[in-house]
Amino acid sequence: MTSIEALKEGINHQQGFFDGIRGAKTYHQCWLPKEEPKAVLFVVHGLAEHSGRYLHIVNYFVPLGYAVYTLDHFGHGRSEGTRNFVEQFEDYTGPLKTYFDTVRESQPNIPIFLVGHSMGGLIGARYLMDHQSDFAGAILSGPAIRI
């Protein structure tokens, strides 16, 4: 997974895996500012994308004091699973909840904003139906929903 944009120097990058749906490894990563974050941007990527495609958000917001957390959905990026296929929509929202709980534990008093693009906007909107109180707000960019 590569990105056209390079990560700015001095940004703290962390990454890893957790056990996702049906035992598949789910890749996650975050970028942290030097000081305590003002807020967290929880980025949810779109179809056939991966979390590394959002370095423009990282490079803009992290130097301003915001943390950025994201994961690769099942079957996307570095996460395991059949490429771009899920058995049920909860295969997207389940790992999102698992990762959100980890982020909330590491940033207990910081507002968290969901940022979803395209299919990530749809996933984010569906997640918010059950977990609206998890987030201080949401930004849905071109969500894949019918209005």
Region roles according to the model:
Residues G46-E49:
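Active-site glycine-rich loops that stabilize anionic/oxyanionic intermediates
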Residues V86-E105:
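Alpha/beta-hydrolase active-site loop
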Residues H117-I147:
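Alpha/beta-hydrolase-fold enzymes
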